[in-house]
From Swiss-Prot:
Residues 22-136 form the Ig-like V-type domain. It is found in: Membrane. GO terms for biological process: epithelial cell morphogenesis; maintenance of gastrointestinal epithelium. Its main location: membrane. This is V-set and immunoglobulin domain-containing protein 1. One of its GO terms (cellular component) is basolateral plasma membrane. The keyword Methyltransferase does not apply. Residues 266-335 are annotated as: Disordered. The gene is VSIG1. Gene3D superfamilies: Immunoglobulins (2.60.40.10). Residues 319-335 have a biased composition (Basic and acidic residues). It comes from Gallus gallus (Chicken).
Length: 335
């Protein structure tokens, strides 16, 4: 709320009275500072008349956030700092000097800083000037990537990009041959870091190194085009072949096992059926011990035994007559 009022106050002060003869000067239009260093932003002002109750204000416009922030305000001997810049700003105290020094500068502090001086007693004049501040930072480790299919006859390109780096890094690609780096300049854009390879057959496979650099230093990343081109395909092919071979072997073993089980089951069924048939035939043949004695027992006097035919003859009327005749003949002979 208070910073917003500070932004409105200069407008109200201008409407209440005219500012005349206030001239703000910024001798340096651009300031470069290393990360963690201190940035001194020079700003002086002059007036043809006494300023009276004037005030000084510094504003910061972040290009990254696209927002304007009030970071410093001075009026009637009191100074204030705000936001991320609180306790980081030291202001000049001599008359006519509105310079400030900002400590521990970070990449997020890169942007435009505006010095403003207002006096309600004077007419309108040149009351503000801006300075660009660049917080220099070494390129971060680049991200390297291959786009496209790394096979013969295919279009591919190598990417190299840093997330941070100020000034903006420039990129260079090199072919790595043991300890020797050979620059690669064909179809290469040093600003974007993209290396185009129109046909892999015209390019020697191997290791490639990207170097991103600026005045603060450099960072590198590498790509192994050989392993991605050959070893990767070989490993993938071998893996697929091994899987297919395992599937085929398992299928063959399963089929053979199923056939063997089916054959064994059929053989067992035939043996059981043969055994049952044999037992049935054996059960139909009468046993001598179980055969009923239907023949006439022989006389005690003669102790004669009936013949097998007589014993086996069934008891019919004809057989009964034959038995009677035999009995009579036997009785006559005994007399």
């Amino acid at each position: 709320m208070f910073p917003t009022m500070l932004k409105i106050f200069p407008i109200l002060a201008t409407l209440a009275g005219h500012v005349h003869g206030v001239v703000v000067t910024v001798p340096e239009k651009t300031v470069n500072v290393k990360t963690g260093g201190n940035a001194t932003l020079l700003c002086t002002y002059t007036s043809s008349q006494p300023l009276g109750n004037f005030f000084i204000q510094w504003s910061f416009y972040s290009a990254k956030e696209s927002q304007l922030h009030t970071i410093y305000y001075y009026s009637e001997g009191q100074s204030y700092s705000y936001g991320e810049f609180k306790d980081r700003i030291t202001a000049a105290t001599s008359p006519g000097n509105a310079s400030i020094t900002i400590s521990n500068m970070q990449p997020s502090d890169t942007g435009s800083y505006t010095c403003e001086v207002f006096s309600p007693q004077d007419d309108a004049g040149q009351s503000q000037k801006s300075v660009i501040v660049n917080v220099l930072v070494k390129p971060s480790k680049p991200f390297c990537k291959i786009e496209g299919t790394p096979e013969k006859g295919h279009l591919i390109y190598l990417l190299c990009k840093c997330d941070q780096g100020l000034p903006h890094p420039t990129y260079r690609w090199y072919k790595v041959d043991e300890n020797t780096l050979t620059p690669v300049t064909e179809y290469f854009n040093p600003d974007t870091g993209i290396l185009y390879i129109g046909n892999l057959t015209t390019f020697e496979t191997g290791h490639y190194r990207c170097i991103a650099s600026n005045i603060m230093g450099n960072s590198t990343c590498e790509l192994d085009l050989t392993s991605m081109h050959s070893d990767g395909n070989i490993v993938a092919g071998a893996l697929i072949g091994a899987i297919l071979a395992a599937v085929i072997i398992c299928a063959i073993v399963w089929v053979l096992t199923k056939k063997a089980k089916k054959k064994k089951s059929s053989s067992n069924e035939m043996q059981v059926m043969a055994q049952k048939q044999s037992n049935a035939e054996y059960a139909q043949v009468p046993n001598e011990e179980n055969t009923p004695a239907t023949a006439v027992l022989p006389s005690n006097a003669t102790n004669e035994q009936p013949s097998a035919d007589e014993a086996a003859a069934p008891e019919t009327p004809e057989n009964d007559e034959k038995h009677e005749v035999q009995k009579e003949e036997t009785a006559g002979s005994s007399f």
